[in-house]
Structure formats: C-alpha cells, structure tokens
C-alpha cells in the first residue's frame, strides 16, 4: 500500500488500457483525446478506445458540440471514462473536461471512475490520474497495464445486440400554413420514442446464426415485461443476477469468435413487433371518435431507418439489456435524426441510413449516419467522412468508412476464398509462406488484401501470353477490396478494349493473344480507376536488388502490388525484405504463371508465391541478366 502525506494509506490504482499507445501520443501535437470504456461491463478504470477532440489544438473545446458528435458515434454500453491532454501537463484539467462533456452527453454527472492524462511532447511520456467517483479527489495512477490481447478482454465476456427498425410516421400539416411544422414534428418524434415501452410492443430476441438453416435460441419480450425489469448494475458477480432471468449468453453457441471483424460480426438480433390486438384486461365496446380538422391539411410521410448496436456482458439479462440499452439507444438515434431532418421538412427529406464500423486500430464499433440521397462521392458526405477519419485517428488517404466497409451481420461470414463480390479466388496467399532468409532485414509488404489471378482462370487458356493480364487483375482486385473502386475486375477482352478505346492498340488487338507490358497496365489503371503509376526502368535483372530501398519505401507509403515485367515474363511483387547495411534482399513474388487448381498448400510448397533472391544459394539467377525490366508502381489514391 502507498502512504499519503497525512500518514494514511490508500490502495494502489490500476489503469488498464486496451487501445494502442499511439492512439494517445500520435501525432505529437497539442490536442485532446477522449477516452472510452464500459464501466458497467468491463473492469473498473479500463480504457477501450480514444477519440480525438476537434478541432485539433483547441485549448477550450466546444463541449456541447463534442457531446453531440460523440453521441452519434458511441455504441450504447460504452461511455466516456476520461480524457488525455497531449502537450499539456494538466492531467487533472483533462479529467474535469471529461466529466463536463460526459454530463452534456447524458445529462448527469458520472458515478463511475474517471481518468485524466497528459502527454509530454518531447518524450511521449504519459502521466495519469484517476478519480474513483464524482467528488472524489484525483490521485496518481500507480500501475498502468497495456493489454497484450485486448480483444479477448473485450469480447470474451462481452457481446453485441443489434436492433433495426423501419418507421413511416404520418405528419399532418395545414395546407396553407407550415409555420408550426417543426413543433408538430418534434412532438411526433417524442411520441414515437415513448411508445417503445407500450404494452402492445413486443421484442423478438434471436441469437446469431452462423450457417443458413441453423436453429438458434429466441424469446419474445413484451412492453409490460420491460416495465417490470429492475435496474441492474454491474457488480462483478453474475451469481447476484436472478437465475431465472435469461442472460445474453443463452443466445450464443458455446464456441464463438472473440474478435469483431467487418466480414463476420455476430450480434443478438432484436426485432420490434407491434401487437395491435393486444388483449386489454378491461373489456370495452369498440368505439369511433370523430375529430374534425379546423382546416385543410396535407400528409407528409416521414420515413426513418433506425439501426443501433449495444455492448453488454454475456452474463447480463437480455430483458435488462433491451430496457436499459436498446430502447434508450433507439431514442437517441431518433433524436439525432430529428435534428438532421427538421431543417428540410418542407423540401426534399434526407435519406438517413446508419452504418456500423470497426476501422483499423479501433477495437470497439462505432456508428455513423449517412445521407444517401446523392451517393458517397457527394461533397458533404466526403467532408463528413474526412471529419470522422480525423476524430477516429484514421489515415486520410484511404477509404475506411464507406458503406462497403460497414460491418456485415449477414448469416455466415466469409472465408479465405470468398470476397464481398462473391469471388471464389484465393486471397492473401502470401500470409502462409515461410521467412525469406535475409539476415537482419526489414520486411516491407503490401498493405491490404488482393485476389490471386493466374493462368487458366475463368476458363481462359492464356498459358504463355497472359501473365501481365493476370498481374493487372491482381492489382485491380487490390483496389476493389480496399474499397477504392466498385467496378469488377476486367477480363482479358475488356482490358484489350480499353487499350483500343484510348488509341494505344488497333481494333484487331481485341481477341488476340498479344502480350502487354507495364506501360499498357498503367494506361488501363488510369482509364478504369483514375490511378496514376510510377515506372522504374532497370537495364538488367542484375540491377533489381539496387531498387530494393525504393521498393521498400513504396510498400511503406503506398502499399499497392507492383508489376514486374521483363522479356516475355511478368510477375506481381508483394513485398521486399531488405538489409540496408549488407545490401542483402529478397523479393516476395506472386507468380501468375501457375496453371493448377487453387490449392493454397500446393501454391506455397511449389514456390508460386514465395521469397525469391536475385541469385539463390545455388548461384541461379531468378531475374534474367540479359533483359531489361519495367517496374510498375501503382499509387494509392488520396481519398476517404
């Protein structure tokens, strides 16, 4: 135990962090980070994620604006648990800011422990203080633990609930006077939110299905059931919950994924049903009452699509989760949509759609609402995504929050041979290969996923002439899988048609078996994707190792596959392993000349994807000495 100045002793304070350290210290510029956790369902003083306060460097952030924007992102079950000042020594001030923004978020002071931190710009050193309750003095943290396996702590005892609700609300407005339309709309939304606990409303609770046709546990809860659910707080012991109350764990199989990915997200599904024939305990005669309208009125249909996620413990009673998480979450989303719609009630109504994401570097899901009227490339939507990238501390040169990046809650999920477009091609085959053998080298690899295209795919016999086409298809698949493009990977004929359309080839080229090279590939990428390319010319295969440093920089900054063309052969380069001191290097080659079945083991063992040295241990040259080579380095588009 640690002694205080007055001689009393206090217990040591442990702070557990699930988020990466760089999310708190990088970039090293003056800023404020909000810390997120789940005080109700995770161990006390646990930080699961960090969000950046906007704009950067603001000494006095607009707390009301911050609270409103965080409300739209935050999944119910997570909460603000602290703040960190980067470039300031005032950890206590950060803690008080966190308390203030949290109060604006929920309308009450936090009863759970709060964290304050400060980061020294020069050293990156972080100092934390904690207050274990409102009004409790902040004390220095005595132990900080950065979890090695944060996903396990988050999901071993945690789970998601998802509720979708389509609403078509009738808004009646006097035909000759729309001055009161906003008040009527607000009243309509508030009335809708209040009805979520009505006796005639039922909640169908279903467990996730991992395969089509698989049975799953399900129950139905009624509004009356929810009104009688007692307030249940986290106490660290599941035994104190009523044993007769169905817990969330009942809806999941004994073995379930302990991670959350875009391709496969498991959640308890909640469907809201309205039982208009609900039996009343009091018998009554059917009656009709007539209310004459004072003036002519028009009907405006307000279409809303609600879609919320909630985080809870698997031991938490599902009825309590619906009552205390799902219904407040739906009410929150209604309120957010109300503010977005009200200014356009008399014009074209926004088409608001919520989506859920777990972008790279973030362990917990976030929700954002997009207006899909004009598509994703519309300027306002692009600016919204850019601000989200800044707040979530995501890079600004790649699309990570587009609709195609959203979590997929469909039955099943994907495996190594399935892509979002339904492709059955092998993906990311290099992940199974052994080390390169370069001593002390630094490995620089492709960033993202790709599909392996090789000879004889799609029923096309291109053996002997189609290797560059296959390399181009692999590169095109990378842009598609990283969400830069939604167009299909082109066939040989479609590639030839592009080259004819731009005037590079004569019409007789279409349907031929003529080779293409790096320059033709650059033309096609520019035409179909608007992608620019850098070309490196090498006079001989012997000189390729001299380009390893430049290639390493490419993979670190661009991360795209590289096409290598020399003589009549073409390869796809996925990375390099380079020792700058010794000059020793190896090239990670994906060979399109493979003609067999898509058998991963056969491909790896046969060397069709593997590390190649310019000269191997037996003195044989992989690259031809008497041929010049062109290296095509496609650039990553700067977009979100």
Swiss-Prot record:
The keyword RNA-binding does not apply. The keyword Methyltransferase does not apply. Its EC number is 3.4.22.-. It is an enzyme of class 3 (hydrolase). GO terms for biological process: proteolysis. Keywords: Hydrolase, Protease, Thiol protease, Ubl conjugation pathway. The active site is at 467, 591, 593. It comes from the Eukaryota. GO terms for molecular function: deUFMylase activity. Pfam families: Peptidase_C78 (PF07910), UfSP2_N (PF20908). Gene3D superfamilies: 3.90.70.130. Thiol protease which recognizes and hydrolyzes the peptide bond at the C-terminal Gly of ufm-1, a ubiquitin-like modifier protein bound to a number of target proteins. Belongs to the peptidase C78 family. This is Probable Ufm1-specific protease.
């Amino acid at each position: 135990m640690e002694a205080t100045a007055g001689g009393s002793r206090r217990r040591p304070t442990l702070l557990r962090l699930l988020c990466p350290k760089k999310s708190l210290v990088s970039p090293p510029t003056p800023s404020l980070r909000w810390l997120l956790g789940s005080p109700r369902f995770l161990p006390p003083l646990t930080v699961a994620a960090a969000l950046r306060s906007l704009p950067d460097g603001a000494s006095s952030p607009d707390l009301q604006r911050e609270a409103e924007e965080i409300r739209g992102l935050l999944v119910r079950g997570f909460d603000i648990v602290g703040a960190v000042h980067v470039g300031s020594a005032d950890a206590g001030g950060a803690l008080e800011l966190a308390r203030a923004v949290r109060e604006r978020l929920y309308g009450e002071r936090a009863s759970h422990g709060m964290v304050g931190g400060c980061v020294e710009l020069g050293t990156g050193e972080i100092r934390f203080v904690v207050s274990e309750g409102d009004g409790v003095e902040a004390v220095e943290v005595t132990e900080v633990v950065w979890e090695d396996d944060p996903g396990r702590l988050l999901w071993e005892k945690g789970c998601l609930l998802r509720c979708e609700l389509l609403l078509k609300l009738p808004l009646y407005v006097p035909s000759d006077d729309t001055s009161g339309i906003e008040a009527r709309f607000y009243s309509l939304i508030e009335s809708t939110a209040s009805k979520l606990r009505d006796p005639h409303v039922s909640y169908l609770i279903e467990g996730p299905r991992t395969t089509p046709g698989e049975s799953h546990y399900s129950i139905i809860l009624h509004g009356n059931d929810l009104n009688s659910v007692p307030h249940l707080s986290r106490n660290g012991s599941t035994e104190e919950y009523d044993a007769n109350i169905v817990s969330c764990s009942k809806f999941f199989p004994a073995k379930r994924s302990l991670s959350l990915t875009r391709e496969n997200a498991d959640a308890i599904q909640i469907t809201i049903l309205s039982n208009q024939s609900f039996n009343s305990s009091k018998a009554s005669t059917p009656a009709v009452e007539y209310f004459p309208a004072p003036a002519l009125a028009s009907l405006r249909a307000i279409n809303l699509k609600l879609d919320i996620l909630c985080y809870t413990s698997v031991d938490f009673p599902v009825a309590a989760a619906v009552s205390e998480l799902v219904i407040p979450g739906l009410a929150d989303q209604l309120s957010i949509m109300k503010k977005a719609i009200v200014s356009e009630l008399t014009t074209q109504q926004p088409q608001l759609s919520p989506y859920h994401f777990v972008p790279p570097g973030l362990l917990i899901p976030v929700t954002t609402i997009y207006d899909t009227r004009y598509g994703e490339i519309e300027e306002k939507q692009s600016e919204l995504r850019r601000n989200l990238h800044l707040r979530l501390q995501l890079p600004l040169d790649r699309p990570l929050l587009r609709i195609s990046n959203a979590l997929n809650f469909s039955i099943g999920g994907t495996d190594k041979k399935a892509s979002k477009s339904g492709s059955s091609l092998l993906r990311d085959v290099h992940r199974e290969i052994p080390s390169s053998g370069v001593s002390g080298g630094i490995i620089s690899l492709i960033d993202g996923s790709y599909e392996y295209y090789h000879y004889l795919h799609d029923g096309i016999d291109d053996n002997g002439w189609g290797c560059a086409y296959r390399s181009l298809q692999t590169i095109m698949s990378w842009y598609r899988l990283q969400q830069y493009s939604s167009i299909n990977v082109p066939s040989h004929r479609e590639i030839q048609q592009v080259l004819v359309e731009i005037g590079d080839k004569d019409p007789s080229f279409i349907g031929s078996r003529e080779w293409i090279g790096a320059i033709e590939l650059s033309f096609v990428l520019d035409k179909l994707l608007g992608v620019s390319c850098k070309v490196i010319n090498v006079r001989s295969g012997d000189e390729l190792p001299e380009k390893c440093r430049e290639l390493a920089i490419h993979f670190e900054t661009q991360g795209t596959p590289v096409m290598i063309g020399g003589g009549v052969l073409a390869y796809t380069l996925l990375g390099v392993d380079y020792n700058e001191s010794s000059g020793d290097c190896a090239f990670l080659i994906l060979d399109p000349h493979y003609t067999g079945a898509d058998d991963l083991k056969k491909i790896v063992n046969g060397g069709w994807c593997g590390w190649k040295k310019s000269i191997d241990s037996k003195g044989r040259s992989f690259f031809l000495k008497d041929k010049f080579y062109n290296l095509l380095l496609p650039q990553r588009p700067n977009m979100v």
